[in-house]
């Protein structure tokens, strides 16, 4: 079963593109081992509610398999290393 990676962001967040890029690079490297979802909390009530459910107070935030793992944008290496340790 693939590891679920959720990246919470907003359109106005200056650091969110780096987090999204790290997640996309992780997907490129790890392929079907991970499932990446980008959730813009300012574009969807469902995404906003999911952020509330996780008690997210800042963006970017990366949730892996239901646990908040990174608040702020990790480097590509940090995210990939974390995901590889979970495989």
Show the residue positions of the predicted features:
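Structural micro-motif
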Residues: 52-63
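Short alpha-helical
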Residues: 14-15, 45-46, 78
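Hydrophobic residues in alpha-helical membrane-spanning segments
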Residues: 15-18, 61, 75
């Amino acid at each position: 079963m693939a590891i679920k990676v959720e990246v919470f962001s907003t359109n106005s967040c200056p650091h969110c593109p780096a987090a999204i890029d790290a997640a996309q690079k992780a997907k490129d490297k790890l392929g079907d081992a991970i499932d990446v979802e980008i959730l813009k909390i300012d574009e969807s009530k469902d995404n906003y509610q999911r952020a509330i459910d996780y008690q997210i107070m800042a963006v970017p935030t990366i949730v892996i398999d239901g646990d908040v793992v990174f608040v702020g944008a990790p480097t590509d290496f940090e995210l990939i290393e974390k995901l590889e340790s979970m495989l």
